[in-house]
Amino acid sequence: MLIGIPLETAPGETRVAATPETVKKLKAQGHTLRVQASAGVAASVTDAAYATAGADIVDRARALGCDLVLKVRSPDAAELALMKSGAALVGMLNPFDKDGLQRLASAGLTSFALEAAPRTTRAQSMDVLSSQANIAGYKAVITAADHYQRFFPMLMTAAGTVKAARIVVLGVGVAGLQAIATAKRLGAVIEASDVRPSVKEQVESLGGKFIDVPYETAEEKEAAEGVGGYARPMPQSWLVRQKVEVAKRVAAAD
């Protein structure tokens, strides 16, 4: 099978859909890999690395004109025009974008949106949401530390004491947990809020403090349990109380 890995063209996008290691594995299975020139440069992967792994370095038209195309982001109109009808597309395709899905269908593509992969043990290797959220949580704290005008940890020196930065994390999913862990390693004091009571233990295990908002009705408690690890919309009455508690922490946060 011809497998294409084109250069991502979305503004600010630096990722690439496959690494040389992936190319090597697919090559060993008998596939022919075509990588667009400079596809991995923004991700610090050279064309030479792909060539060494067994890929052919080609132009955009040849990379997009394969039987299977691997992309990070959904193709734009110009890219769709270069893809052949009947080809397969795998990537993060934003399955909630109905117009975008219609364009893919109109182009005759069989598309697989990796965001829709179930969160099960067997599908863990395809869980792009968790892997990218992990990176986002880490980078969010690193970026915050870069913009913050003081230190994150408490420092005691002969010149005086610098208090630790106080951070509030909203949402304790994969990104939130990584943000808490990263901020804690940098020495910050963290408080976190989430609608699900089950994450309180996770927050505390990472050294953070959970912002507890008690449930006053059975409806609130049922909604907070979530489904399949995902939170559900909470009743307005609970959201009002959460807003009050979070506002107190935000006012004192750095």
Spans of features found by a protein language model:
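Glycine/serine-rich phosphate-binding loop and adjoining beta1-alpha1 elements at the start
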Residues: L2, E8, A77-R166
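Small/polar-residue-rich loop-to-helix segments that shape phosphate-bearing ligand pockets
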Residues: E115-V141, H147, K209-S237, A251
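Short gly/ser/thr-rich secondary-structure transition/capping motifs
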Residues: T52-I57, K71-R73, Q149-P153, Q236-R241
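Short beta->alpha connector loops at strand-helix junctions that form conserved
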Residues: A37, R60-A61, M92-L93, L114-P118, ...
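Residue-level detector of alpha-helix initiation sites
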Residues: S74, I135, G173-V174
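An N-terminal-biased, well-structured beta-alpha scaffold segment characteristic
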Residues: L2-R103, A107
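Glycine-rich phosphate/diphosphate-binding loop of Rossmann-like nucleotide-binding domains
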Residues: P6-V45, P153-R249
